[in-house]
Amino acid sequence: MLTGAVARRYAQALLEIGIQTKTLDALEGELGRFVEMIGHPELQRFLFHPSIVVAEKKDLVGRLLATGAFSETARAFILLVIDRRRESYFADIFREFVRLANKVRNIEEARVTSAVELAPEQVERLRSQLAAATGKAIVLRMAVDPDLIGGLVVAFGDRIIDGSVAGKIRDLRESLLRSPLPSLS
C-alpha cells in the first residue's frame, strides 16, 4: 500500500475519534509531540529497526508515553500503529492528520516564499487578503528565497500564485522563445 494511502487511513480514523470525543486539538498536539520525540536518531533507529520485535517497541514507547502526559486515546493509537508495524509512517500520518483537521476547522495553509523577509504588517495584509479570497482562516508558512529577486510566490490548496520577478522573467523568456522571429529580408 502506498505511503499516502496508509497515512490517510490512520489519520482519518484518528480524526473521526477526535471529532466524536471533541479532542481534535489535544490529539494533534499529542501526535505532534510524539513525532518530535521519535525524531531523536537513537529512538528512530530502535523504533524503525525491522528485527526488533513489536513487543519491545511497544514496551519502550509505552514507558515514554507514560512520562509525557499523553491521553489514553493518543497512547492507544500510537501503540496500535506500532502493533501494525506502521511505525515508519508516523510523520506522514501526522501531516495528513493536520491537513484533515484543518479542513474540518475551515483552515487553509498557505506557503509564502518572498525574496526578502516581509514586515509583520505585510504578512497580516496578505493573510487577510487570502482569507477574503478563500473564505477560510489562513495559516501562513513563510520562507525567504533571494533567488526570486523580488515579489513573492504563494501556494495554497492546489493553486500557486507566482508574483516574483524571477517568475516574470521566466514567463517573458518562454514567451519570447515561442514567438516567431520576424524575417529580416
Curated annotation (Swiss-Prot):
GO cellular component: plasma membrane; proton-transporting ATP synthase complex
Membrane-topology descriptor: Peripheral membrane protein
The keyword Transit peptide appears for this protein: no
UniProt KW keywords: ATP synthesis, Cell membrane, CF(1), Hydrogen ion transport, Ion transport, Membrane, Transport
Compartmental location: Cell membrane
Coiled coil (UniProt feature): none
Top-level taxon of origin: Bacteria
A GO molecular function held by the record: proton-transporting ATP synthase activity, rotational mechanism
InterPro entries: ATP_synth_OSCP/delta_N_sf, ATPase_OSCP/dsu
A Pfam family recorded for this sequence: OSCP
Function field: F(1)F(0) ATP synthase produces ATP from ADP in the presence of a proton or sodium gradient. F-type ATPases consist of two structural domains, F(1) containing the extramembraneous catalytic core and F(0) containing the membrane proton channel, linked together by a central stalk and a peripheral stalk. During catalysis, ATP synthesis in the catalytic domain of F(1) is coupled via a rotary mechanism of the central stalk subunits to proton translocation. This protein is part of the stalk that links CF(0) to CF(1). It either transmits conformational changes from CF(0) to CF(1) or is implicated in proton conduction.
Assembly description: F-type ATPases have 2 components, F(1) - the catalytic core - and F(0) - the membrane proton channel. F(1) has five subunits: alpha(3), beta(3), gamma(1), delta(1), epsilon(1). CF(0) has four main subunits: a(1), b(2) and c(10-14). The alpha and beta chains form an alternating ring which encloses part of the gamma chain. F(1) is attached to F(0) by a central stalk formed by the gamma and epsilon chains, while a peripheral stalk is formed by the delta and b chains.
HAMAP family reported in the protein's UniProt record: ATP_synth_delta_bact (MF_01416)
Family affiliation: Belongs to the ATPase delta chain family.
Protein name: ATP synthase subunit delta
Source organism of this protein record: Heliobacterium modesticaldum (strain ATCC 51547 / Ice1)
